[in-house]
């Protein structure tokens, strides 16, 4: 059929008076799209059939006999700004995959919820002066409308928000199970692994039966402990527990933050406010108990390597030893100072020790320094006690970044105490310094200035000795003399020196590691430490326990109440959910960003009627006090994927039968080691927050028997980012990108850009409201239609890569759809124009090769290359006198996951009554797959001089012979100096020019 694009294409793709009634333009696209979206909704086209319950109907009737496929996106925050065209990239990709698998005969679960608690929603409500629930629900409604208009094939029965009452109930229920659980590192799991969460009642039974010694009360029976002591003992074991330790306090936000929410610069991830270390009583999650499993099980899941690496680095597994130093305190008692080091071989070079300003040993320092203490060790203070108190206050007023950064002078204070080196017996002066943090390791370090830059700088500042214990390898080209007295020799390999003693402090035996390589020395010293009872080899992790409290209003309340003695009690499951009270004052109390001494005040604490409650927890009605903190926004997103299986289930967090069918480890054809969601699509920015937290919660629920797989997400795919040009005037102010005009080339290879006649500068980066370069999906729907929008986003490049948005390029996708439409539909009458003609040989081969190739591209999530192949096929059909049904129907089927509305319309006009969403994906006829010939390019000095049609199986020698014959005249009868053959497509010739 003849292609007459230029006769009718308009700049804005809108219909004009002269256009035929059934020409595919933006207006017709909108009519088609909205009509089919209504039909899909009414017929339940995308309803996925459950094993049982209310969700087993829809067009997927009897679908539970089919294999399952669970695809999902990282659900969005319901922002007040709504969506711009960059947001749906992942949603569209997942939708294409879901539609493809549906056409392969699988029962596809694809749904969308909303992550509605937390700081983003609360801050938007504060800005608008409205209650968070009002603004959040309005934002959800707008976002749901935008997504629906996109034609995403969600099962809308499964949609929910994390603020929904029934959802909050189960989030609180999960917390209660983690509170009522402890981690037993020696327990053998059902999968044969070691270490598991267990019910706290089993721990109590072990205490009662004396099977396990009660920490701190070895001489007492469990029944002899009062309830406060019992609660304290259990708190030290619980997975969800109350901690009083240094936390990240952010005065500017009025709340504490998890480590993962603090940037490398020591600022809050949201708002960029300073963050300070404070000792506060907070809820924490014992994620560190799962550190090893979180690392090891990365090997069982199909995730991008960069995300796995980010999680491994964040968890920070290291191998070393715990070493115990004796410290004689001011009260005459000898106390233990535990240090973790990855280099126990350097004990011979340890010349002092340092503790954090929050280390408990500082409660046992003397009143004053001895007369022999150097003035440089006193920090200018006359009194040790007063100096220590002031130094601690100064350190706590700094951010973690300021305390640990290498730049600047090293500060510290001698504590008046000495630690005894367990190997050499040397008395090591014990300092307190701000660069050691209590939240990392043990809050104490053994300082080795000969091998560590910070220790070296500290030693120089305080006049402490430097001992080198490692020298460079002989073939390294380095000499220790180049470092001696000038810098530390920092190396993980080398030859050990200055490391021997005739009589060790602890055992009195001789110990020497001189002459050994570092790794051998580490092993030998670790063995000695264990034999001496002053150390043990162990694995340590950078990962800290997850701070789980927030002093905010807009979050899930904890299902916890406190009695008159301050003992925490779980609210019974029958009382869940604990709802947020509607309070007039929900804004957090914030402070000046640098007010490190400010105190958190939770908004819920202001509502006394809600805080004070009468409950019967088994021993009569008593007065209790609710916990006034709320959970972080990560709580709701930790487990939402499971609620898609049945968001209306009032009896279970997730039903075991539904879990086995949708996420189990023994599904036919999907015997994954990990089980879990088949495909999870989202941004890489969530690698160490949401993804790590979800894996942790899931493993705990797995241990406790609530789920049947150890991992939540089997395959993870990170989409790239859609970026855009922004424009600034001479003042550096952003101007509306859609009002900028592109002018002539400036003469240096770049076009010029003007805004209302004024020259502006172009920059490339993110799309955002402040940059005035946002394009909304609503604009695309109105001016091009949802299918053109979908087609453009999917054709822009590989899904995993970032790409620039350019509205001017959208028209290319529109023209492709117009050409395809004309191949099926008469623009004047709307009638179907395809014929029943048989396919010629050329069309048969092109069609079947296209089916084979597009299937491969869809499996690999490469819709951009699939689209390119479909365009080639459509162009061929356009060149035919008549378009045969046998060729165009497979084309429409293959395009339908990408442009579903227009394909539904064409499928209907082709005479089909069943939705194309459930039509069978085409299968190629292998007799017509594979090319008869391929084009071989012959190059001389990099320039193409001939093209040959050859057998795709031709060998290199035959291809070389044909190529030389084809360019013989250009070689002037001479043999070439070199011939490079890459059969069957390239021959590169280097001529002999001598």
PLM features per residue range, with description:
Residues 54-132, 136, 160-171, 339-342, ...:
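N-terminal catalytic cores of NTP/NDP-binding nucleotidyl/phosphoryl-transfer enzymes
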Residues 37, 284-318, 360-413, 576-609, ...:
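Amphipathic alpha-helical
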Residues 1-64, 374, 465-474, 487, ...:
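Basic, alpha-helical terminal appendages of large translation-related enzymes
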Residues 2-29, 34-35, 39-43, 128-337, ...:
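Residue patterns forming the tRNA-binding/recognition surfaces of aminoacyl-tRNA synthetases
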Residues 94-95, 107, 364-473, 478, ...:
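Catalytic alpha/beta core of large soluble enzyme barrels
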Residues 23-27, 134, 317-322, 471, ...:
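Long, charged, mostly alpha-helical binding arms that flank functional sites
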Residues 115, 186-193, 236, 241-248, ...:
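Helix-rich, typically C-terminal accessory recognition domains appended to large enzymatic cores
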Residues 2-13, 17-72, 102-111, 135-141, ...:
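Conserved oxyanion/phosphate-binding beta-strand-loop segments in alpha/beta enzyme cores
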